[in-house]
Curated annotation (Swiss-Prot):
Keywords: Cell inner membrane, Cell membrane, Membrane, NAD, Quinone, Translocase, Transmembrane, Transmembrane helix, Ubiquinone
Annotated EC: 7.1.1.-
Subunit structure of this chain's protein: NDH-1 is composed of 13 different subunits. Subunits NuoA, H, J, K, L, M, N constitute the membrane sector of the complex.
Its biological purpose: NDH-1 shuttles electrons from NADH, via FMN and iron-sulfur (Fe-S) centers, to quinones in the respiratory chain. The immediate electron acceptor for the enzyme in this species is believed to be ubiquinone. Couples the redox reaction to proton translocation (for every two electrons transferred, four hydrogen ions are translocated across the cytoplasmic membrane), and thus conserves the redox energy in a proton gradient. This subunit may bind ubiquinone.
Catalyses which reaction(s): a quinone + NADH + 5 H(+)(in) = a quinol + NAD(+) + 4 H(+)(out)
GO molecular function ontology, one term from the record: oxidoreductase activity, acting on NAD(P)H, quinone or similar compound as acceptor
Compartment(s) of residence: Cell inner membrane
PANTHER family to which the protein is assigned, alphabetical: NADH DEHYDROGENASE SUBUNIT 1, NADH-UBIQUINONE OXIDOREDUCTASE CHAIN 1
The protein's name: NADH-quinone oxidoreductase subunit H
Length: 325
C-alpha cells in the first residue's frame, strides 16, 4: 500500500504552492527596504546605500546581520508577553492577507468564497499589533502613537471596506478569482475609478505609510509605538510594514487592474509587473508628499473620502439596477 495517494499528493502540492508564494512575499518585503532607499536617493538626487556589495546589493544582508546581533532588550517596566506578541502580529497579519490573492489562474494559497471579508478581518487585526506595542511598552510616546493608530485605522477602514463593495456588486462575489474573471473585458478601475482612489488612499493609511505615518511620526513621537523595540523584534515591525505594501499593491492589481490577466506574457509575469508598479508608487508618494497634521488626516478621511465612497457605491447600485431592468 503506497502512502502517496492522489489525495495526499494534491495536498502536498497545495502546501508547496502556499510556502513558495508566502516566501516570495516575505523576500519581496525584505528587498523592498533596499529598493526604497535606492529609489529615494534617485528621487532626491543622491546615491543611497552603495557601499556593501556591488552597488549596495548586499545592504539588506548587512542590515539583517546587524539586527540579528543586536541586544534583544525588553524594558523592565513593560508587559513582557504582550511586548513580544506585538511584532509577531504585525508581521503575520498582512502576510496572511496575501493568502487570498491569486497570482495566476492556478496559483493561490487559499481560494476563499469570503476572500475580501478575510482581508478586511486581517487588516483590522493588524492594528492590535500597534495597540499592544504602545500599551505594553509603558512609554508615553508609544502610547500616543498607539492611540493615533487606533483612531486612524478606525477611520480609514470604514471606507476601505465600502470602497470594495462596488467591485463586489459588479462581480457578484467576494471570491478573488471570480473578481479577476469578471474583468476579462474591462478592468474595474474604469467603472470603479473613485473606488480605486479611496481604496488606494485607505491602503496607504492601513500600512501607516507616509503621508499617513502619524502613529510613528519621528519629529513628534520619537518613532512612536516601536520606540522601545530593538533587534529582531524591531526587524519584524520593519519587514511587516513592507509586506503590507506588497499585499496592498497586489490587492489593488487583483481588484481593479485585472489581476494576472494580460496579453503575450505568462500570467505570473503580468501580476508581478503590475504589483511592482504600485510598490514603486508607494515609494514615490513618500518622496513627494509632506506629512499633514493629525487633525487634517482625520478630517480628510471623514469629510472627503467617506462621502466619495458612499457616492460611488450609490452610483454603482443605480447602474446595476438600471441594467437589470
Amino acid at each position: 500500500m503506497s502512502w502517496f495517494t492522489p489525495e495526499l499528493i494534491e495536498i502536498l502540492i497545495s502546501v508547496l504552492k502556499a510556502v513558495v508564494i508566502l516566501l516570495v512575499v516575505v523576500t519581496c518585503g525584505a528587498f523592498m527596504s533596499f529598493g526604497e532607499r535606492r529609489l529615494l536617493g534617485l528621487f532626491q538626487n543622491r546615491y543611497g546605500p552603495n557601499r556593501v556589495g556591488w552597488g549596495g546589493s548586499l545592504q539588506l544582508v548587512a542590515d539583517m546581520i546587524k539586527m540579528f546581533f543586536k541586544e534583544d532588550w525588553v524594558p523592565r517596566f513593560s508587559d513582557r508577553a504582550i511586548f513580544t506578541l506585538a511584532p509577531v502580529i504585525a508581521f503575520t497579519s498582512l502576510l496572511l492577507s496575501f493568502a487570498i490573492v491569486p497570482v495566476s489562474p492556478t496559483w493561490a494559497v487559499a481560494d476563499l468564497n469570503i476572500g475580501i471579508l478575510f482581508f478586511l478581518m486581517m487588516a483590522g487585526l493588524a492594528v492590535y499589533a500597534v495597540l499592544f506595542a504602545g500599551w505594553a511598552s509603558n512609554n508615553k510616546y508609544s502610547l500616543l502613537g498607539a492611540m493615533r493608530a487606533s483612531a486612524q485605522t478606525l477611520s480609514y477602514e470604514v471606507f476601505l471596506g465600502l470602497s470594495l463593495m462596488g467591485v463586489v456588486a459588479q462581480a457578484g462575489s467576494f471570491n478573488m478569482q471570480d473578481i479577476v474573471n469578471s474583468q476579462e473585458h474591462v478592468w474595474n478601475v474604469i467603472p470603479q475609478f473613485f473606488g480605486f482612489l479611496t481604496f488606494a488612499i485607505a491602503g496607504v493609511a492601513v500600512c501607516h505609510r507616509h503621508p499617513f505615518d502619524q502613529p510613528e511620526a519621528e519629529q513628534e513621537l520619537a518613532d512612536g509605538y516601536h520606540i522601545e523595540y530593538s533587534g529582531m523584534k524591531f526587524g519584524l515591525f520593519f519587514v511587516g510594514e513592507y509586506i503590507g505594501i506588497v499585499t496592498v499593491s497586489a490587492l489593488i492589481v487583483t481588484l481593479f487592474f485585472g489581476g494576472w490577466q494580460g496579453p503575450f506574457l505568462p500570467p505570473f509575469i503580468w501580476f508581478a509587473l503590475k504589483t511592482a508598479f504600485f510598490m514603486v508608487m508607494f515609494i514615490l508618494i513618500r518622496a513627494s508628499l509632506p506629512r499633514p497634521r493629525y487633525d487634517q488626516v482625520m478630517s480628510f478621511g471623514w469629510k472627503v473620502c467617506l462621502p466619495l465612497t458612499l457616492l460611488n457605491l450609490l452610483a454603482t447600485a443605480a447602474v446595476i439596477l438600471y441594467n437589470a431592468q
